[in-house]
Amino acid sequence: MERLIVLDTETTGIEPSEGHRIIEIGCTEIVDREITENNEYHQYVQPERNVGDSVRIHGITDKFLTGKPKFEEIVSEFMDYIKGATLVIHNAPFDLGFLNHELKLFGSDERIEDQCTIIDSLELSKQQRPGTLHNLDSLCRRFEIDASARTVHGALLDAQILAQVYLAMTGGQSTLFSSEQSSDGQNQKNQKIVRVKRDIGTIKVVEANAQELEAHQNYFSQT
């Protein structure tokens, strides 16, 4: 039995080493191969910098983020929510890189992958069907999952959609939503999973070029 948390983030750019920060975290819970509605996690975060051109990707403006809590104000609640769970993330090095960077800025030596088991759904998709497209929109078309609400990137919406995609990739689900059930267990017998190595923090996800927005858009076309 294992509890799965499907996680996504939105950020101001593609490289935390260049000062980019998280602006949104969204999580959806899966228990016993059912997506639960009553235990999601969703938080907008004040990045302490301008959003810049990345607003074209996610539609989140500086004005909207005014007054939102800083990462240091939500970190305890967030870590309590995910602690001990198995995280499902599409292109895990990107989100983990940002989350671990935020933890470091907070003054913590913790890393997400030291607290949670990681499943990279992007790598799983590549193993299942090499040579095809593996971004979220393509996977929705492959598994006939409705993504019509996805007009821009959004952490919670993308986590909700990825939860459906992941279950379809790994054998389907018993019920789409269960608002009654939320526990610490998830049965993953006979599932093929791809786990991210412990040294994932050393992986460089995307190399930024002179045209940051173009790179940002090209990167997100894969996820």
Task: Report residues per predicted region.
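Short, well-ordered coil↔helix boundary/capping segments
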Residues: 130, 153-156, 210
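Acidic, Mg2+-coordinating catalytic module of metal-dependent nucleases/exonucleases
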Residues: 86-92, 98, 135-191
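Catalytic subdomain that performs nucleotidyl-dependent activation
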Residues: 115-133
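Acidic two-metal-ion nuclease catalytic site recognized across multiple nuclease folds
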Residues: 168-223
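Alpha-helical structural motif
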Residues: 50, 74, 95, 117, ...
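Conserved non-catalytic scaffold segment of RNase H-like nuclease domains
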Residues: 1-115, 126, 138-152
